[in-house]
């Protein structure tokens, strides 16, 4: 049975594992959205969910890493500038933890350029989208990375 959770924050340990804790390497989530602005993370995850993706949201890099290990998303969309772990630090950590996961960065801050140059100096090149982004443009960009699973599921986790 699929559960639909709309904009409800639930503790990480309460996330249902029926579809996500898999030993065969299959994904529990298609897309994980990470942003310290809850309304942005929740809204993007909801838009993706309504477009057929199994989408979840996290509000910081640490929670995102836990969810990525558990749910093995095909794509993580992360804000670049966040307290604690930046989106670029998250992307680099995901390379070793969940290597099959692709990362798409998005930001509305000019300081992002400095972070991207630092990443490029380390030999990493990331795709970045500007905030705000029209929902149709986000769906189009996500579809370039991953196809929807066509399941109704959505969870926000902090």
Question: What is the meaning of each model-derived region?
Answer:
Residues 79, 107:
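Active-site residues of response regulator receiver
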């Amino acid at each position: 049975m699929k559960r639909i959770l709309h904009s409800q924050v639930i503790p990480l340990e309460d996330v249902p594992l029926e579809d996500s804790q898999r030993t065969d390497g299959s994904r529990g989530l298609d897309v994980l959205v990470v942003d310290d602005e809850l309304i942005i993370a929740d809204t993007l995850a909801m838009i993706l969910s309504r477009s057929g993706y199994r989408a979840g949201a996290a509000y910081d890099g640490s929670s995102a890493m836990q969810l990525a290990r558990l749910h093995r998303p095909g794509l993580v969309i992360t804000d670049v500038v966040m307290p604690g772990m930046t989106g670029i630090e998250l992307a680099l950590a995901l390379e070793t933890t969940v290597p099959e996961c692709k990362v798409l960065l998005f930001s509305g801050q000019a300081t992002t350029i400095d972070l991207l140059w630092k990443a490029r100096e380390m030999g990493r090149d990331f795709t970045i989208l500007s905030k705000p982004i029209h929902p149709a443009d986000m769906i189009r960009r996500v579809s370039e990375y991953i196809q929807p699973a066509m399941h109704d599921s959505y969870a926000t986790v902090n």
